[in-house]
């Protein structure tokens, strides 16, 4: 009986220690987790509008990737660079110059910036922390993101 109580107490301690960490959430199969969000790289090139629509169909709450720190960009680059090599992925920003966008397509605040040009839609390089403007009708790879 004493051994059972000891083992039960030990399991309770382990459970409680994990409950305050990110162990409480997990991303669906094929998605990668970072800072309580899930990300997936898709190896197909489509225009910005179709890319945003595609992301919203992948998972509830999913949109084109939004960035809120250089560390988050580094995480996404670690996922895109090995798969897509030297290319570009759509980000959840469009009509930035025409409408002075202040938020991402997922509704979060535009609180981190790394501009490198002007146009309607914004891409991120798959190999480093640079954003470039491109014609929204051009075809680029897709990274989707949602809050876990």
Curated annotation (Swiss-Prot):
Signal peptide positions (record): 1-23
Expression sites (tissue/organ): Expressed by the venom gland.
Disulfide bonds: 27-38, 55-144, 121-136
Keyword Ribosomal protein: no
GO terms for MF: toxin activity
Top-rank taxon: Eukaryota
Keyword Signal appears in the UniProt entry: yes
SUPFAM superfamilies assigned to the protein according to its UniProt record, in alphabetical order: C-type lectin-like
Localization per Swiss-Prot or TrEMBL: Secreted
Record-linked SMART domains: CLECT
Cellular component GO terms, alphabetical: extracellular region
Record-linked Pfam families: Lectin_C
Annotated ranges, domain C-type lectin: 34-145
Keywords, sorted A to Z: Disulfide bond, Hemostasis impairing toxin, Platelet aggregation activating toxin, Secreted, Signal, Toxin
Main subcellular location of this protein, as a coarse class: secreted
Known role: Platelet-agglutinating factor that acts in a vWF-independent manner. Binds specifically to platelet GPIbalpha (GP1BA) to a distinct binding site from that of flavocetin-A.
PANTHER family: MANNOSE, PHOSPHOLIPASE, LECTIN RECEPTOR RELATED (PTHR22803)
Family: Belongs to the snaclec family.
Record text on subunit structure and interactions: Tetramer of heterodimers of alpha and beta subunits (alphabeta)(4); disulfide-linked.
Protein name in UniProt: Snaclec mucrocetin subunit beta
Organism in which the protein naturally occurs: Protobothrops mucrosquamatus (Taiwan habu)
């Amino acid at each position: 009986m004493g051994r059972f109580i000891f083992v039960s107490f030990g399991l309770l301690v382990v459970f409680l220690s994990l409950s305050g960490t990110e162990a409480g959430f997990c991303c669906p199969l094929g998605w990668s987790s970072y800072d309580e969000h899930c990300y997936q790289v898709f190896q197909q090139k489509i225009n910005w509008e179709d890319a945003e629509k595609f992301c919203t169909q992948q998972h509830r709450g999913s949109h084109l990737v939004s960035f809120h720190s250089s560390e988050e960009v580094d995480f996404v680059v670690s996922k895109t660079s090995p798969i897509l090599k030297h290319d570009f992925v759509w980000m959840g920003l469009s009509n930035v110059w025409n409408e002075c966008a202040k938020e991402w397509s997922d509704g979060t605040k535009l609180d981190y910036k790394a501009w490198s040009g002007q146009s309607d839609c914004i891409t991120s390089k798959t190999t480093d922390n640079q954003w470039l403007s491109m014609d929204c009708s051009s075809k680029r790879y897709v990274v989707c993101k949602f809050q876990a």
